[in-house]
Amino acid sequence: MQFLQEKVKLIKKEDPVMLKSPEDFPVYWFETSDSVSHRYQFQSDGHLSMKVVDDARPVPQKMVESFLNKFFPSGYPYSVNEGYLRYTQFRALQHFSSAALSVLSTQSLLFAAGLRPTPAQATVVSWILKDGMQHVGKLICSNLGARMDSEPKRWRILADVLYDLGTGLELVSPLCPHLFLEMAGLGNFAKGMATVAARATRLPIYSSFAKEGNLSDIFAKGEAISTLFNVAGIGAGIQLASTICSSMEGKLVVGSILSVVHVYSVVEQMRGVPINTLNPQRTALIVANFLKTGKVPSPPDLRFQEDLMFPERPIQDAGNVKVGRALHKAVKPSEVQRLKQVFVEEKFLLSHGKSWTDMVLEHDATGEDALRGWLVAAYVKSMTKIYNDPDDIILQDAYDKMNDVFNPFLSQVQAKGWYTDRFLDGTGTRFAW
């Protein structure tokens, strides 16, 4: 016992071992990915520094990855939705052709006005035409914002068609110099409308690719791509203007080709955009696919089925539904009370005609309400072909069938990534009791 006490005393008398604090040790580690080794270290101020230790990548791979880092969102391709690469490729071609065409039209404008392209004179022309007629076009087009929310793809295409129309008027202005002011003014009026439509539709298009809350990154990299190919297009336009397009005939031929390439590029861009909001056309396509196959398509699956030029055209397999007519025009006054009794808890009314079915929505109806109404209309359409029952019985049977399938149908819709909290029907008229 005495021996143990002496041993404990000896241990207590020994100097304690002094351990270094964590701050005395440099915190660093190495990460290797795709033949590149990086050394990461926390500095004394808490910031993380990175240094390339070894890079065994071949030069072409380094160049490609450097380009991707500068012009594509971080984490690409896993940080964006399907279709982004196709969209970006044709966006680059669109901006290249547009910039080249713009150079040719500017040259024609200056020539038609009898001006030399000096900075002072060019500024005067820009102020009179662009800051005048172009602003008028912007004001008129700004009233169509709700329609652009509903059909951003269609309006994006229309924006580029308007832009090419305006550029075309500028391009041919030297052929009729006595109408210079009228043609140049109309050209810039069309360009003003195109500018508003293009900018207004940019956000919903970019939003469709955001997968990890990275909308700002996608927007910034998209604008970087646009700037890069705009500069390249301006360079190509300057070269064309001094060679092939030095004559009016050359301008007309090359300008027509560039315009076709420009519009084709934007159409292909829009085919690659997987927008996940519900509008009349996408809702009808979802219902039609569900009734045919029992499955709901995802936004990437549905994008190639959309009619980009005539989206308001009714789809027969989904009940030939049209949305947006005023209640007093779509439904006979004598029918309103009867329809209210059928759809007593719903936020829509359906009026079946010979050629199509009108659906009128309440002011606070959502995408779910539109889906319910579309299903009823589609079931009525299919039952009418099979049964000879009175319209009231068919309508009630279709409504009951919709209620039976709606919950699993809605679960599929939401699981596929569709946003059902809103229904974008453009400037469609709604009602309130």
Curated annotation (Swiss-Prot):
What outcome is recorded for mutants in which this gene has been deleted?
No visible phenotype under normal growth conditions. Extremely stunted growth, failure to develop true postembryonic leaves and arrested primary root elongation, when grown in vitro.
Entries under InterPro entries matching the protein: RUS_fam, UVB_sens_C, UVB_sens_RUS_dom
Q: Does the keyword Transcription apply?
A: no
Where's it mainly located?
Answer: plastid
**Where found in the cell?**
Plastid
Is Secreted one of the keywords UniProt gives this record? no
Task: State any GO CC term.
Answer: plastid
Biological process annotations from GO: auxin polar transport; response to UV-B
Outcome of swapping S105L: In wxr1; reduced auxin transport from the shoot to the root
Expressing tissues = Expressed throughout the plant, with a higher expression near the root apical meristem, in the cortex region of the root elongation zone, in lateral roots and emerging lateral roots. Not detected in extreme root apical meristem or root cap.
Keyword terms, alphabetized: Plastid
Main function = Involved in a root UV-B sensing pathway and in the protection against the hypersensitivity to very low-fluence-rate (VLF) UV-B. RSU1 and RUS2 are probably both negative modulators of the same UV-B perception pathway, which when overstimulated in the roots causes a block to postgermination development. Required for polar auxin transport and to maintain the normal levels of PIN proteins in the root.
State the oligomer form and interacting partners: Interacts (via the DUF647 domain) with RUS1 (via the DUF647 domain).
Report further notes. Several mutations in ASP2 (AC P46645), but not all, and any of the non-phosphorylated B6 vitamers can suppress the rus phenotype.
Family, per entry: Belongs to the RUS1 family.
PANTHER family in UniProt: PROTEIN ROOT UVB SENSITIVE 2, CHLOROPLASTIC, RUS1 FAMILY PROTEIN C16ORF58
The name under which this protein is listed is Protein root UVB sensitive 2, chloroplastic
Q: Name its species.
A: Arabidopsis thaliana
